[in-house]
From Swiss-Prot:
Pfam families: Aldo_ket_red. The lineage of its organism: Eukaryota, Fungi, Dikarya, Ascomycota, Pezizomycotina. It comes from Fusarium vanettenii (strain ATCC MYA-4622 / CBS 123669 / FGSC 9596 / NRRL 45880 / 77-13-4). This is Aldo-keto reductase NECHADRAFT_45914. CDD domains: AKR_EcYajO-like. Signal peptide: none annotated. Pathway: Secondary metabolite biosynthesis. SUPFAM superfamilies: NAD(P)-linked oxidoreductase.
Length: 370
């Protein structure tokens, strides 16, 4: 074969070159499984209906953000059935249709466990979602939440309809359900995979012994195991390092943490008050907004390193986190926030800088398991 022929065979197609030039992220295996997800992952909590929470983006504001994320390579989108009472999933489906995004080119992640209200009973904020003990007393909501076989199948069928798809890439349990036998939950989840409704399984915040028990049972029965853990982890909240992160690393489970910037706390100076609607509505016991000298000292060190490196503070926090996880889940309120997060890709801290950021950490009450 002539050199010219070899050159033609090796020549990169223009379409591939164009695609690579537009891709601003890297893709990482989700733990030990074969699926690759974008870093970062787009968080859908911010998308849906501002009636649910005032800082949530309505459809007309969310659509261009979803388009901008996809155009830049953020092809992994995380949501939950309960986000905006199902509206988050619906907006994502509309974006795929409006922008002609092929279903096979995005990774859709959603969750089950909490109550999704009937539309006529839709309450702002948490509403019924946080009152499971009362939901079980209602003819409308009994078997509509939790991790029973009935609740899981009800949830996945509803999510498939809202998302406008016949399969979910990663179906996650939002929390652990102590009222249901683990075998019932894991058997139902395995059946979803075998039926083709779900391709991978993931889990979210819970105690490590609970997660390990579910994984061990699935392994013993030959059922599908979880490939990801979506836990609460950032420079301010590191309780997950005690057990969950070690367990996941040892067993090949991918880590995709929520609140990587501590609701923006790690992206602004200690003296700087947030002007976001979300922060102004979250000062109700959150560890991020409470008066806490230890948190302020950690954030001050983030700022110090950011100034030295001429980086935004968010890049320092993300550089520290990206070394330890598969990909953080970030909620974007503007295209500018997407650009800022993507500019952090590939940035690394020195070992001395990492120690400097970590050494002030003090134990905190567990948050996010309920």
């Amino acid at each position: 074969m002539s050199k010219t022929s070899v050159d033609k065979l090796l020549r990169i197609p223009q379409s591939l070159r164009d695609s690579i030039s537009r891709t601003r992220v890297d893709y990482r295996h989700l733990g030990n499984c074969g699926l690759r997800v974008s870093n970062p992952i787009l968080g859908g909590l911010h998308i849906g209906n501002s009636r649910w929470l005032p800082w949530v983006l309505n459809e007309e504001d969310a659509m261009p953000i979803l388009k901008a994320a996809y155009d830049r390579g953020i092809n992994t989108w995380d949501t939950a059935n309960v986000y905006s009472n199902g509206e988050s999933e619906k907006v994502i489906a509309k974006a795929l249709r409006k922008y002609n995004i092929p279903r096979s080119k995005v990774i859709l992640m959603t969750k089950c466990y909490r109550v999704v209200c009937d539309s006529e009973n839709f309450d702002p904020g948490s509403g019924v979602t946080m009152h499971h003990e009362l939901a079980d007393k209602s003819k409308d909501y009994v078997n509509q939440w939790g991790l029973s076989r009935a609740a899981i199948f009800n949830a996945v069928e509803a999510s498939l309809e809202r998302l406008g798809t016949h399969y979910i890439d990663i179906f996650q349990i939002h929390r652990f359900d102590p009222t249901v036998p683990i075998a019932e939950t894991m058997s139902a989840l395995n059946d979803l995979v075998k039926a083709g409704m779900v391709r991978y399984l993931g889990a979210s915040s819970m105690w490590t012994y609970q997660f390990a028990a579910m994984q061990n049972l699935a392994h013993a029965k030959g059922w599908t195991k979880f490939v990801s853990m979506q836990n609460h982890y950032n420079l301010i909240y590191r309780e997950e390092e005690r057990e969950m992160i070690r367990y996941c690393n040892d067993t090949g489970v991918g880590l995709i943490p929520w609140a990587p910037l501590a609701s923006g706390r790690l992206a602004r100076r200690p003296s700087q008050q947030s002007v976001s609607i979300r922060a102004s509505n979250s000062r109700n016991g959150s560890i991020y907004e409470a008066d806490d000298s230890n948190t302020d000292k950690i954030v001050s060190r983030v700022e110090e390193i950011a100034v030295k490196r001429n980086w935004p503070m968010s890049h320092v926090a993300l550089a520290w986190l990206n070394k330890r996880v598969t990909a953080p889940i970030i909620g974007f309120s503007t295209v500018q926030r997407i650009e800022e997060a993507l500019a952090a890709v590939g940035k690394e801290l020195s070992e001395d800088e990492e120690r400097y950021l970590e050494e002030l950490y003090a134990p905190r009450p567990i948050q996010g398991h309920s």
